[in-house]
């Protein structure tokens, strides 16, 4: 049996037209992407969630209840389109953990707390688009207690844009502070064979893979980070 997991990539931002009408965009790697209503609904159902395709369908039905829009695309086609556009990530595996690792390993980590624009965009997404009560959305600005692994991930991710696989290798090497780009390269790519493309494969067998992956997933589910691409 193969498992598949999905998560949203990037962060939400709300723009205004000249006549003051609001429209949402998703920003990934400093590039803005326009989404139609169906795409935005699917992306929103995955923001700070890690879901299977059937779970996406349930969340999508809940979000579209009461909305009056039609789309010629099926939900499956919409999900596939978002994956192709790089706005949704997917991971496959023979177990729940393997699919989670495959999902996370190539994604980059951006702490929401490090960027006030990310945090404010996340607040707007919850309040305006998702319709969450103001009192619930404002909790995004409160600080949660993190585990030691989570604190270390946030500390390193505040110093450099790192993928999950790179964070696993940092944990394996005991790196707690990044003093320079040279130190980072020496830690991550200290031989001729290791590249950013094959590092996720190499780190899958690391003893740090499970605890770091679990910590990253927990940070994401608690709205402390967003996923990025380079």
Feature map (PLM): residue ranges:
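N-terminal leader segment of winged-helix/HTH proteins
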Residues: 1-20, 89-90
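Short, flexible segments with low predicted structural confidence
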Residues: 13-14, 27-31, 139
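A short, structured beta-strand/loop element
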Residues: 21-26, 30, 35
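Long, charge-rich, low-complexity alpha-helical segments
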Residues: 33-230
